[in-house]
Design a protein with these regions (language model features):
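Class I S-adenosyl-L-methionine-dependent methyltransferase catalytic core
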Residues: 2-175
Length: 175
């Protein structure tokens, strides 16, 4: 889940924007990350995006050396304390879903055929993804080396990198 930088349209929106929660990166900086050098020759990329970043996501996947395959997950967000649908931000419509794109390089093997696309789950803190997504990635890909970039936690069986965790690797930006 890259820390996408968004255009803010109002002072009210600025207080709820990603920039008010954590440092963000512009598209050029995200593309410059050496993800392609880190990735195995046969692997999958799960890239969380919000709909305003859909076009940019294709450029990021290309820059990292991956080919889009499908939408892996559609997270329908529920309110923190109820099962009602969460109301997020949005200029045209209020966002209450996020998608995770699946891209590959080489020929990774699929370990399971019964992994579902839709995740109905409560929101937690800003930008935190549901644990169910991690479980589904593990089921889909099987017991392979895994790394989460921009991680917020260090789950068992995963290497992590990010500014909110003790990183297992060091990334040098190619800028």
């Amino acid at each position: 889940d890259p820390p996408w930088a968004y255009k803010v349209w109002s002072k009210k929106g600025a207080g709820r924007s990603a920039e008010s929660h954590y440092p963000t990166m512009d598209i050029a900086a995200i593309k410059a990350l050496p993800v392609g050098e880190l990735a195995d020759k046969d692997c999958a990329l799960f890239l969380w995006i919000t709909f305003p970043m859909l076009r940019e996501a294709w450029g990021v996947m290309d820059a990292w050396g991956f080919t889009f395959k499908t939408v892996a997950f559609v997270w329908i967000k529920q309110c923190r304390k109820s099962d009602g649908l969460f109301t997020g931000m949005g200029y045209w419509t209020r966002a209450n879903a996020e998608i995770c794109l699946l891209a590959t390089r080489g020929h990774p093997k699929r370990a399971a055929r019964d992994v579902k696309q839709v995740i109905l789950s409560h929101v937690e803190r800003h930008s935190q993804k549901p644990e169910e997504a991690r479980r589904r990635i593990e089921a889909l890909m099987g017991d392979v080396p895994r790394i989460e970039l921009f991680a917020r936690a260090s789950p068992p069986g995963w290497d992590v990198w990010g500014n909110e965790v003790a990183s297992d690797i060091r990334l040098a930006e190619r800028m």
